[in-house]
Amino acid sequence: RTDAGVHDERYIANFHTESRIPVERLPFAINTHTPEDIVVREALEVADDFNAILSCQKKEYTYRIYNSRIKNPFYVNRAYFYPKHLDEEVMDRAARAFEGTHDFRAVRSVGTETKTTVRTVHYCRVSRSGDLLELKVCADGFLYNMVRAITGTVLYAAEGKLTPEDIPEILASGDRSLAGPTVPPGGLYMTRLWYEDERLNE
């Protein structure tokens, strides 16, 4: 599941069933029981040992920022409203500083425990289309609130509160207080998942 307020454009779940409903009809059957904002788009038969969480090789999250002096009501709880102009080139440089294999303790919520805080970020980039900025980050796994803290740190770079060149030192310190804030959940989307079964990557 995702945290409260976070969105999914692509989400995969698995379950075992003895239902006689044909697999291609399952989405229609399930959608009669789901809330309006949850839709099952496809069902597939997979190997018995498949696990939607453990079998996932990497994920992509997208954080959306609506960068305009005037709010857009259609983006309420769908993008983070930021009225001051943001330099996407500075933000992209800051985002790229997170790429690679690092200890990401400095950008996770304090008080959360995991076996390891080392993750590999395959890409972390910022782009703009009109008033909408997107930070896309793909990794082999994420710590709690990691993407939202990365986004807050990238925003700090745009605000001049730190430089993109400061980020490697912040990561090395493991000190959460040196990184940027955890931005609100409404702008965060899970947008891609990768599995060995290629059918699930389409």
Identify the meaning behind each predicted range:
Residues 1-202:
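Structured-RNA-binding interfaces characteristic of tRNA pseudouridine synthases
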